[in-house]
Amino acid sequence: DADIHGIAVQEMAPWGTEVILGSVNDAAFGPTVMFGLGGIFVEVLKDVTFRVSPVTKSQAEEMIGDIKGAAILAGTRGEKPKDRVELAKAIYAYSCMIYDLQDEIKESDANPVLVYDEGNGLKVADARIILKAK
């Protein structure tokens, strides 16, 4: 006797390099955006970088280069470079969203974001947003 309130149907995303985008609305700095390698890597390596939101497009590109895992995104050991152009656009857009909704959002994360080979973009596989108490 299952009590089903709905179902979700979505495509199975192909494997990609996992990164994380996150945010915290900090009491001192205001809305901040975080970027790093995602999935289990963020838990094990904690290789992330933060900026105050909103970031510029140039700062979004810098964030990609700031992490130790930047070489993975650049392509290493025979792997093709990942789509860092679309990734920088995603960091920028995420940062703008966090800034624009800072009165509503306490914290958020998109993890994993699957980044594909250069020219093939990315997909958000999982995300959560925690709203501020009213």
Tell me what each language-model feature is.
Residues D1-K134:
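ATP-dependent carboxylate/acyl-activation modules
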